[in-house]
Amino acid sequence: MKKTDELRTIRIDPLVTPAELAQRHVITPSIMDTVISTRKNIANIMTGLDPRLLVIIGPCSVHDPVAAVEYAGRLQVLRKKYESRLEIVMRTYFEKPRTVIGWKGLISDPDLNGSFHVNNGLSIARKLLLDINKLGVPAATEFLDMVIGQFIADLISWGAIGARTTESQIHREMASALSCPVGFKNGTDGNIRIAVDAIRAASVEHLFLAPNKYGQMTINYTSGNPFGHVIMRGGKSPNYHAKDIAIAIKYLHEFTLSEYLMIDFSHGNCLKQHRRQLDVGESIAKQIRDGSTAIFGVMIESFLEEGSQKVIDNKSLVYGKSITDPCLGWNDSAFLLEKLANAVDSRF
Protein backbone atom coordinates (compact mmCIF):
# COMPACT_ATOMS: atom_id res chain seq x y z
CA MET A 1 0.00 0.00 0.00
CA LYS A 2 1.35 3.40 -0.96
CA LYS A 3 1.91 6.05 1.71
CA THR A 4 2.17 9.81 1.50
CA ASP A 5 2.78 10.46 5.19
CA GLU A 6 5.32 9.47 7.90
CA LEU A 7 7.84 8.67 5.18
CA ARG A 8 10.72 9.95 7.30
CA THR A 9 9.55 8.57 10.65
CA ILE A 10 11.71 5.57 11.50
CA ARG A 11 10.17 4.62 14.85
CA ILE A 12 7.09 5.41 16.94
CA ASP A 13 7.09 4.38 20.62
CA PRO A 14 4.15 4.56 23.05
CA LEU A 15 4.39 7.40 25.56
CA VAL A 16 3.22 7.35 29.16
CA THR A 17 0.39 9.82 29.76
CA PRO A 18 0.79 12.75 32.16
CA ALA A 19 -1.97 11.27 34.34
CA GLU A 20 -0.18 7.91 34.58
CA LEU A 21 3.11 9.57 35.50
CA ALA A 22 1.41 11.78 38.09
CA GLN A 23 -0.09 8.67 39.71
CA ARG A 24 3.33 7.06 39.80
CA HIS A 25 5.04 10.14 41.28
CA VAL A 26 2.40 11.91 43.36
CA ILE A 27 2.54 15.54 44.41
CA THR A 28 1.99 15.88 48.17
CA PRO A 29 0.04 18.60 50.01
CA SER A 30 3.26 20.10 51.41
CA ILE A 31 4.82 20.29 47.94
CA MET A 32 1.63 21.90 46.62
CA ASP A 33 1.98 24.51 49.35
CA THR A 34 5.61 25.17 48.34
CA VAL A 35 4.66 25.65 44.69
CA ILE A 36 1.61 27.81 45.37
CA SER A 37 3.32 30.04 47.93
CA THR A 38 6.43 30.51 45.78
CA ARG A 39 4.39 31.47 42.72
CA LYS A 40 2.56 34.03 44.86
CA ASN A 41 5.83 35.37 46.28
CA ILE A 42 7.28 35.75 42.78
CA ALA A 43 4.16 37.57 41.59
CA ASN A 44 4.45 39.95 44.54
CA ILE A 45 8.16 40.55 43.91
CA MET A 46 7.70 41.25 40.20
CA THR A 47 4.91 43.73 40.84
CA GLY A 48 6.76 45.64 43.57
CA LEU A 49 4.68 44.42 46.51
CA ASP A 50 7.65 42.51 47.94
CA PRO A 51 11.07 44.27 47.94
CA ARG A 52 13.06 41.04 47.92
CA LEU A 53 15.05 39.78 44.92
CA LEU A 54 14.09 36.63 43.03
CA VAL A 55 17.13 34.42 42.32
CA ILE A 56 16.90 31.57 39.81
CA ILE A 57 20.10 29.58 40.35
CA GLY A 58 21.30 26.13 39.38
CA PRO A 59 23.02 24.10 36.68
CA CYS A 60 22.73 24.98 33.02
CA SER A 61 21.00 21.62 32.63
CA VAL A 62 20.33 18.67 34.91
CA HIS A 63 22.01 15.42 33.88
CA ASP A 64 22.65 13.70 37.23
CA PRO A 65 19.71 13.53 39.69
CA VAL A 66 21.95 12.59 42.63
CA ALA A 67 24.16 15.66 42.17
CA ALA A 68 21.07 17.81 41.62
CA VAL A 69 19.56 16.72 44.94
CA GLU A 70 22.86 17.39 46.73
CA TYR A 71 22.94 20.85 45.17
CA ALA A 72 19.33 21.44 46.25
CA GLY A 73 20.21 20.44 49.80
CA ARG A 74 23.01 22.99 49.93
CA LEU A 75 20.78 25.60 48.33
CA GLN A 76 18.07 25.02 50.92
CA VAL A 77 20.45 26.14 53.66
CA LEU A 78 21.14 29.43 51.85
CA ARG A 79 17.48 29.84 50.92
CA LYS A 80 16.66 29.73 54.62
CA LYS A 81 19.57 32.00 55.55
CA TYR A 82 18.61 34.75 53.11
CA GLU A 83 14.83 34.29 53.05
CA SER A 84 14.15 37.82 54.28
CA ARG A 85 16.00 39.31 51.28
CA LEU A 86 16.08 36.67 48.54
CA GLU A 87 13.49 34.30 47.08
CA ILE A 88 15.80 31.52 45.90
CA VAL A 89 14.45 29.06 43.32
CA MET A 90 16.50 26.22 41.83
CA ARG A 91 17.09 26.13 38.10
CA THR A 92 16.10 22.60 36.97
CA TYR A 93 16.31 22.54 33.18
CA PHE A 94 15.45 19.22 31.53
CA GLU A 95 15.16 20.38 27.91
CA LYS A 96 17.96 21.97 25.91
CA PRO A 97 17.37 23.99 22.75
CA ARG A 98 20.28 23.50 20.36
CA THR A 99 21.52 25.94 17.75
CA VAL A 100 22.32 22.97 15.49
CA ILE A 101 22.72 19.59 17.21
CA GLY A 102 23.72 18.22 20.61
CA TRP A 103 22.34 16.57 23.76
CA LYS A 104 18.74 17.71 24.13
CA GLY A 105 18.38 17.16 27.85
CA LEU A 106 17.60 14.62 30.57
CA ILE A 107 14.03 13.98 29.46
CA SER A 108 14.97 13.31 25.85
CA ASP A 109 18.13 11.30 26.53
CA PRO A 110 18.54 10.36 30.21
CA ASP A 111 21.32 7.86 29.48
CA LEU A 112 23.44 10.48 27.65
CA ASN A 113 24.11 8.08 24.80
CA GLY A 114 21.52 8.77 22.12
CA SER A 115 19.23 5.93 23.23
CA PHE A 116 16.34 8.38 23.80
CA HIS A 117 14.48 6.55 26.57
CA VAL A 118 11.96 9.37 26.90
CA ASN A 119 9.53 7.55 29.19
CA ASN A 120 12.37 6.94 31.63
CA GLY A 121 13.53 10.54 31.27
CA LEU A 122 10.08 11.87 32.12
CA SER A 123 9.89 9.62 35.17
CA ILE A 124 13.36 10.67 36.39
CA ALA A 125 12.54 14.35 35.90
CA ARG A 126 9.23 14.21 37.75
CA LYS A 127 10.68 12.25 40.67
CA LEU A 128 13.60 14.66 40.88
CA LEU A 129 11.27 17.65 41.02
CA LEU A 130 9.37 15.98 43.86
CA ASP A 131 12.65 15.31 45.72
CA ILE A 132 13.82 18.92 45.30
CA ASN A 133 10.49 20.43 46.33
CA LYS A 134 10.34 18.04 49.29
CA LEU A 135 13.50 19.74 50.59
CA GLY A 136 11.61 23.03 50.58
CA VAL A 137 13.40 24.27 47.46
CA PRO A 138 11.05 25.45 44.68
CA ALA A 139 11.93 24.64 41.07
CA ALA A 140 12.25 26.61 37.83
CA THR A 141 12.48 25.29 34.28
CA GLU A 142 12.40 26.26 30.62
CA PHE A 143 9.32 25.19 28.68
CA LEU A 144 10.54 24.13 25.25
CA ASP A 145 8.49 21.17 24.02
CA MET A 146 4.76 21.83 23.75
CA VAL A 147 3.81 18.53 25.43
CA ILE A 148 6.42 17.96 28.15
CA GLY A 149 4.97 20.67 30.39
CA GLN A 150 1.91 18.48 30.94
CA PHE A 151 4.13 16.02 32.84
CA ILE A 152 5.90 18.44 35.21
CA ALA A 153 4.22 21.89 35.24
CA ASP A 154 2.39 21.24 38.53
CA LEU A 155 5.80 21.07 40.24
CA ILE A 156 7.23 24.26 38.70
CA SER A 157 7.15 27.63 40.48
CA TRP A 158 8.69 29.73 37.69
CA GLY A 159 9.09 29.12 33.98
CA ALA A 160 11.11 30.53 31.11
CA ILE A 161 10.68 30.77 27.38
CA GLY A 162 14.14 30.77 25.82
CA ALA A 163 15.80 33.21 23.44
CA ARG A 164 15.25 30.90 20.47
CA THR A 165 11.52 30.48 21.12
CA THR A 166 10.34 33.82 22.56
CA GLU A 167 9.19 34.90 19.10
CA SER A 168 7.30 31.63 18.52
CA GLN A 169 3.52 31.97 18.47
CA ILE A 170 2.89 28.52 19.93
CA HIS A 171 5.22 29.20 22.86
CA ARG A 172 3.45 32.46 23.59
CA GLU A 173 0.15 30.58 23.53
CA MET A 174 1.57 27.94 25.87
CA ALA A 175 2.81 30.65 28.25
CA SER A 176 -0.69 32.12 28.33
CA ALA A 177 -1.88 28.82 29.81
CA LEU A 178 0.91 28.17 32.33
CA SER A 179 0.00 28.51 36.01
CA CYS A 180 3.38 29.96 37.03
CA PRO A 181 5.00 33.33 36.26
CA VAL A 182 6.91 33.13 32.96
CA GLY A 183 10.01 35.01 31.83
CA PHE A 184 10.73 35.68 28.16
CA LYS A 185 14.36 36.06 27.13
CA ASN A 186 15.40 38.70 24.64
CA GLY A 187 16.48 37.29 21.28
CA THR A 188 19.92 35.79 20.71
CA ASP A 189 20.79 38.97 18.80
CA GLY A 190 19.83 41.10 21.82
CA ASN A 191 16.41 42.18 20.52
CA ILE A 192 14.33 43.20 23.55
CA ARG A 193 11.21 44.11 21.59
CA ILE A 194 10.38 40.48 20.86
CA ALA A 195 10.32 39.72 24.60
CA VAL A 196 8.03 42.69 25.22
CA ASP A 197 5.78 41.53 22.38
CA ALA A 198 5.75 38.04 23.91
CA ILE A 199 4.58 39.39 27.27
CA ARG A 200 1.75 41.24 25.55
CA ALA A 201 0.75 38.19 23.53
CA ALA A 202 0.86 35.79 26.48
CA SER A 203 -1.20 38.09 28.69
CA VAL A 204 -4.38 37.64 26.66
CA GLU A 205 -6.72 34.78 25.81
CA HIS A 206 -5.70 32.15 23.27
CA LEU A 207 -6.76 28.77 22.02
CA PHE A 208 -4.40 26.01 20.97
CA LEU A 209 -4.45 22.28 20.35
CA ALA A 210 -2.70 19.92 22.75
CA PRO A 211 -3.13 16.55 24.47
CA ASN A 212 -4.74 16.59 27.91
CA LYS A 213 -3.48 14.66 30.94
CA TYR A 214 -4.97 11.46 29.54
CA GLY A 215 -3.45 11.74 26.07
CA GLN A 216 -6.64 12.87 24.33
CA MET A 217 -6.13 15.70 21.84
CA THR A 218 -8.08 18.74 23.02
CA ILE A 219 -8.78 22.38 22.26
CA ASN A 220 -7.36 24.51 25.07
CA TYR A 221 -8.84 27.94 25.80
CA THR A 222 -6.58 30.08 27.99
CA SER A 223 -7.23 33.13 30.17
CA GLY A 224 -3.79 34.71 29.63
CA ASN A 225 -0.81 34.95 31.97
CA PRO A 226 -0.60 38.28 33.86
CA PHE A 227 2.90 37.54 35.17
CA GLY A 228 5.03 37.56 32.04
CA HIS A 229 8.32 39.47 32.24
CA VAL A 230 11.51 40.21 30.30
CA ILE A 231 14.77 38.36 30.94
CA MET A 232 17.79 40.38 29.79
CA ARG A 233 20.31 37.74 28.65
CA GLY A 234 22.57 39.80 26.42
CA GLY A 235 23.06 39.26 22.71
CA LYS A 236 25.83 40.50 20.47
CA SER A 237 26.88 42.48 23.55
CA PRO A 238 25.85 42.49 27.23
CA ASN A 239 22.65 44.29 28.24
CA TYR A 240 22.77 44.32 32.04
CA HIS A 241 24.02 47.89 32.45
CA ALA A 242 21.76 50.68 33.71
CA LYS A 243 21.41 52.24 30.24
CA ASP A 244 20.26 48.90 28.77
CA ILE A 245 17.75 48.41 31.56
CA ALA A 246 16.42 51.93 31.01
CA ILE A 247 15.77 51.12 27.33
CA ALA A 248 13.89 47.95 28.26
CA ILE A 249 11.83 49.80 30.86
CA LYS A 250 10.93 52.39 28.22
CA TYR A 251 9.57 49.62 25.98
CA LEU A 252 7.55 48.17 28.87
CA HIS A 253 6.20 51.60 29.78
CA GLU A 254 5.15 52.19 26.17
CA PHE A 255 2.65 49.33 26.47
CA THR A 256 1.67 49.96 30.12
CA LEU A 257 3.37 46.75 31.23
CA SER A 258 4.88 46.07 34.65
CA GLU A 259 8.21 47.95 34.72
CA TYR A 260 10.25 45.20 36.33
CA LEU A 261 12.67 42.75 34.72
CA MET A 262 15.15 39.96 35.33
CA ILE A 263 18.87 39.89 34.53
CA ASP A 264 20.52 36.68 33.32
CA PHE A 265 24.13 36.75 34.55
CA SER A 266 25.17 34.12 31.99
CA HIS A 267 24.94 33.73 28.20
CA GLY A 268 25.51 37.00 26.31
CA ASN A 269 25.87 38.98 29.51
CA CYS A 270 28.97 37.07 30.60
CA LEU A 271 30.25 36.85 27.01
CA LYS A 272 30.08 33.07 27.46
CA GLN A 273 32.83 33.24 30.09
CA HIS A 274 31.20 31.74 33.17
CA ARG A 275 33.39 33.49 35.75
CA ARG A 276 32.25 36.84 34.41
CA GLN A 277 28.91 36.09 36.07
CA LEU A 278 30.67 37.40 39.18
CA ASP A 279 31.32 40.72 37.42
CA VAL A 280 27.71 40.92 36.28
CA GLY A 281 26.65 40.19 39.85
CA GLU A 282 28.85 43.00 41.16
CA SER A 283 27.26 45.43 38.71
CA ILE A 284 23.72 44.36 39.58
CA ALA A 285 24.42 44.53 43.31
CA LYS A 286 25.71 48.09 42.85
CA GLN A 287 22.65 49.09 40.80
CA ILE A 288 20.41 47.74 43.55
CA ARG A 289 22.39 49.56 46.24
CA ASP A 290 22.15 52.73 44.16
CA GLY A 291 18.37 52.50 44.26
CA SER A 292 17.33 50.57 41.14
CA THR A 293 13.89 49.08 41.65
CA ALA A 294 13.50 47.78 38.09
CA ILE A 295 15.56 44.64 38.75
CA PHE A 296 13.22 42.18 40.45
CA GLY A 297 15.16 39.02 39.66
CA VAL A 298 18.40 37.45 38.47
CA MET A 299 19.44 34.16 36.93
CA ILE A 300 22.75 32.41 37.64
CA GLU A 301 24.27 29.24 36.15
CA SER A 302 25.83 27.36 39.05
CA PHE A 303 26.64 23.79 40.08
CA LEU A 304 28.70 21.90 42.64
CA GLU A 305 31.88 22.08 40.54
CA GLU A 306 33.09 24.94 38.37
CA GLY A 307 33.22 24.74 34.58
CA SER A 308 31.90 22.09 32.23
CA GLN A 309 32.88 18.76 30.71
CA LYS A 310 32.21 16.75 27.57
CA VAL A 311 30.46 13.38 27.57
CA ILE A 312 32.99 10.90 26.19
CA ASP A 313 32.32 7.18 25.70
CA ASN A 314 33.87 4.97 28.39
CA LYS A 315 35.07 7.96 30.41
CA SER A 316 33.62 8.72 33.84
CA LEU A 317 32.04 12.12 34.37
CA VAL A 318 33.21 14.49 37.09
CA TYR A 319 30.49 14.51 39.74
CA GLY A 320 28.60 17.79 40.03
CA LYS A 321 30.05 19.40 36.87
CA SER A 322 27.89 20.64 33.99
CA ILE A 323 27.86 18.81 30.65
CA THR A 324 26.45 21.83 28.80
CA ASP A 325 27.35 25.47 29.54
CA PRO A 326 30.10 26.04 32.13
CA CYS A 327 28.84 27.07 35.56
CA LEU A 328 30.15 28.78 38.66
CA GLY A 329 31.23 26.38 41.38
CA TRP A 330 29.55 26.20 44.76
CA ASN A 331 31.85 28.55 46.68
CA ASP A 332 31.55 31.33 44.10
CA SER A 333 27.79 30.80 44.01
CA ALA A 334 27.48 31.16 47.78
CA PHE A 335 29.64 34.30 47.64
CA LEU A 336 27.42 35.78 44.94
CA LEU A 337 24.22 35.06 46.88
CA GLU A 338 25.67 36.78 49.95
CA LYS A 339 26.62 39.82 47.85
CA LEU A 340 23.12 40.05 46.39
CA ALA A 341 21.47 39.62 49.79
CA ASN A 342 23.59 42.42 51.24
CA ALA A 343 22.68 44.69 48.32
CA VAL A 344 18.97 44.05 48.82
CA ASP A 345 19.28 45.37 52.39
CA SER A 346 19.12 48.83 50.81
CA ARG A 347 15.51 48.17 49.76
CA PHE A 348 14.31 47.87 53.34
UniProtKB/Swiss-Prot annotation:
GO cellular component entries: cytoplasm
Keywords carried by this UniProt record: Amino-acid biosynthesis, Aromatic amino acid biosynthesis, Transferase
Pathway stated in the Swiss-Prot or TrEMBL entry: Metabolic intermediate biosynthesis; chorismate biosynthesis; chorismate from D-erythrose 4-phosphate and phosphoenolpyruvate: step 1/7
Any matching Pfam family: DAHP_synth_1
Job of this protein: Stereospecific condensation of phosphoenolpyruvate (PEP) and D-erythrose-4-phosphate (E4P) giving rise to 3-deoxy-D-arabino-heptulosonate-7-phosphate (DAHP).
Transmembrane regions: none
Protein name: Phospho-2-dehydro-3-deoxyheptonate aldolase, Trp-sensitive
Domain of life, source organism: Bacteria
Main EC class the enzyme belongs to: transferase
UniProt cross-references to NCBIfam families, sorted A to Z: aroFGH, PRK12755.1, PRK12756.1
EC number: 2.5.1.54
Organism, scientific name: Buchnera aphidicola subsp. Baizongia pistaciae (strain Bp)
GO molecular function: 3-deoxy-7-phosphoheptulonate synthase activity
Family: Belongs to the class-I DAHP synthase family.
Catalytic activity: D-erythrose 4-phosphate + phosphoenolpyruvate + H2O = 7-phospho-2-dehydro-3-deoxy-D-arabino-heptonate + phosphate
GO biological process assignments: amino acid biosynthetic process; aromatic amino acid family biosynthetic process; chorismate biosynthetic process
Keyword check for Aminoacyl-tRNA synthetase: no
Signal peptide: none
